[in-house]
Amino acid sequence: MPLEVCLLRKTCGISRVIRLLDCFESHDSYIIVMERPVPCKDLFDFITKNGMLSEDMARNFFKQVVETVIACHKRGVIHRDIKDENLLVNLNTNDLKLIDFGSGAYLKNGPYQDFDGKLTFSLLPNYQYKRHIKAVNLKNVKL
């Protein structure tokens, strides 16, 4: 079973994490079925369409992301690839959902030796020295 599925199961019930509906294995791949809030856009497309966020909206989004990261950490999960393309915006409520745990890992106290996320959003010293710690998850939150 892919680690992403295990991480999604551990975060089940966190309101701002995409919900795993089902998963099954085919002959050469694993199929993951997740909820799709309607109507929604990822945060990148939302900003592209609507322009710069107001200060109030940016503050609201930032608060939601931080609360979600903290909730994931309490469940022993670190996302490691938080970026605008991995946040869905519900267009009716402006609630966010964190998606794509494919770069995630189980939370641990020591440094991480691997990284699968997008280098653009990583902290360079951690990439150079191949160290990834829990604090990086919050340092990478940008709006």
Protein language model features and the residues they cover:
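The N-lobe alphaC helix and its flanking beta3-alphaC-beta4 segment of protein kinase-like domains
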Residues: 1-14
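Short beta-strand micro-motifs within the conserved protein kinase catalytic domain, predominantly
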Residues: 19-28
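A conserved loop-to-beta-strand element in the N-lobe of protein kinase catalytic cores
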Residues: 27-35, 44
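AlphaC helix of the protein kinase catalytic domain
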Residues: 42-53
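Activation segment signature within eukaryotic-like protein kinase domains
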Residues: 61-62
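Catalytic-loop of the protein kinase fold
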Residues: 73-90
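Conserved activation segment of eukaryotic-like protein kinases, specifically the C-terminal portion
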Residues: 113-126
